[in-house]
Amino acid sequence: MNRGQADMKQPLLKLEQVEICYRRTPVVHGLTLEVAPGEILGIVGESGSGKSTVIKGIIGLLGNEGAVTEGKIYYKGEELLHGTPEELRNIRGPEMGMVFQNAGASLCPIRKIGDQLYEAVLQHERVSRTEVRRRAMELFEKMKLSEGS
């Protein structure tokens, strides 16, 4: 199979018995689902029910306090939970991302903006940390923010 092309016979996305923990506390239990190529999936639920946590687990944005601790996640037949950050970026590519339902809550208020921007760019682009830092500094200057923001 060519990377980046989904086989119409296999799921585009597949989760098998996924468990996600935050600070060692399980918050998502035994999640199993399949999304076929061309299929649309909507995740709905009450506030705090784990919608964003599931998406962050799939795309690898749980941060230092969260982790997928059980199960398997596949995208186009390739496992997303193992491999180097570079290998995982290549699998996910620019196709995976997250759209926040509340733009005001998109950034974590207790973490530095710069750290959050660095993580997002490093997660999805094939650039060096030096290049990420350079781009972030340009953005900070345009927004009249200091690097420590």
Features from the language model and the residues they span:
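Conserved structural motif at the start of ABC-family nucleotide-binding domains
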Residues: 13, 28-30, 91
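Conserved ABC transporter NBD signature motif
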Residues: 67-79
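Q-loop/switch helix immediately C-terminal to the Walker
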Residues: 102, 109-123, 135
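The feature captures the beta-strand-to-loop junction immediately N-terminal to the Walker
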Residues: 44-46
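Helix-to-loop junction immediately C-terminal to a conserved catalytic motif
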Residues: 59-63
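ABC ATPase NBD coupling module
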Residues: 80-97, 123, 129
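ABC ATPase nucleotide-binding domain
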Residues: 14, 32-34, 74
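Conserved ABC ATPase "signature" region
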Residues: 131-149
